[in-house]
Amino acid sequence: MAQQKVIKYTVEHNRKDGVSEEDFIEWFTNTLIPQMVPVMQKNNILKYAVHKTDHQISTAFQSQVDKVRPGWVVSKCDLILEHWVNDLGDIMKLSQDPEWAAALKDQDVWMDNSKSNIHIGYDTIYIEDGTITNVPRK
């Protein structure tokens, strides 16, 4: 029997205009994360990671990207939240959990959810720990 692929569900989030990057990260890390993670675990989230973007590096890199890939855009989001699940139903279950709603009660003070983007798919690893893997031989 083929092994089921784990689904990767990612969300790009932006802080609300007027909220400093420092205050946003402080709130996210020290207030929101401790409230969210236990509820995620309860709702079968297999793995959760946060990708914090660096606006200074992103802005500088955009000028380099423009030279080699005109039209490509370096994301301006503040956070990319990465969730791994066996079934997207677990994401839906999480979103309907009253504890989840309670954890997110202040999110509109801090985040501009009108700019959020969702990505759904699978990870396939081709280099891990410096070693090539999963590449068909010629």
Curated annotation (Swiss-Prot):
Question: Which family does the similarity line name?
Answer: Belongs to the tpcK family.
Using the record's annotation, list all stretches that form the EthD domain: 18-113
EC number(s) per UniProt? 1.-.-.-
Q: What induces it?
A: Expression is co-regulated with the other genes from the iso-A82775C biosynthesis cluster and probably controlled by the cluster-specific transcription factors iacI and iacK.
Where are the annotated coiled coils located?
A: none
**In biotechnology, how is it employed?**
Iso-A82775C is a precursor for the biosynthesis of the anticancer natural products chloropestolides A to E via a Diesls-Alder reaction with maldoxin. In the absence of the prenyltransferase iacE, siccayne accumulates instead of iso-A82775C and can also be condensed with maldoxin to produce chloropestolides H to K, which show also antibacterial and anticancer properties.
Question: In which pathway does this enzyme or protein participate?
Answer: Secondary metabolite biosynthesis
What InterPro entries has UniProt attached to this entry?
Answer: Dimeric_a/b-barrel (IPR011008), EthD_dom (IPR009799)
What name is this protein filed under?
Dehydratase iacD
Gene Ontology molecular-function annotations: monooxygenase activity
Name which cysteines form disulfide bonds.
none
Tell me the leader sequence span: none
Q: What happens when the gene is disrupted?
A: Reduces slightly the production of iso-A82775C.
The first-level EC class reads: oxidoreductase
Q: Alphabetically list the UniProt keywords.
A: Monooxygenase, Oxidoreductase
